[in-house]
Amino acid sequence: TGVSAKMLDRLQIPYKEAIVHGASHAGYYPGAIMMDIKINFSPEDGKLLGAQAVGIDGVDKRLEMMSAVIRNGGTIYDLMELEQAYAPPYSSAKDPVNMAGFVADNMLSGKVKMISWRELKDMDRSKVMLVDVRTAEEFAMGSIEGAVNISLDGSRGEYQKLPKDRTIVVFCAIGLRGYIAARVLMQHGYDVVNLNGG
């Protein structure tokens, strides 16, 4: 709904994008299925420009919510504050739409720098270090080529082994653990970015 990234590029309209992965309803209630949401928003004022959602259950409801925000000229801050009836079979206390707004706010407020897979693909790998913050078991199932594994669940002292003369790109499966790792590293003086969407 709204304007796609491809169209924004074609129209040369500046935008940022946030990608989140969330459950269709409360995770403790049986049958929760993951959905993916991507929002495009203005880097100046956070105006919501477009949204996409992929999944099986509840995607239509999320797109309707975001369509209403776009139609009313709303922003990512409106996504953060959107409320709907809470019932575990239908939604979570913090809906994936809310989470998309929170991620976008983190980007605009400077709480964390994000990088897209397209930007990562074009980076000079000699100037970055890829750090997969998932568990060792998850890392063993596959990761981005050249990444090292320093689990967020492990000792935070492990992070001090990272070089400070390179940009650290952290990532996980969804983006949350990458965000936490990025915040920890930022507080220790590292130049760090989180891979958008995990």
Regions found by a protein language model. Give the residues of each.
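Rhodanese-like catalytic fold shared by cysteine-dependent sulfurtransferases
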Residues: 77-88, 92-129, 136-169, 173-198
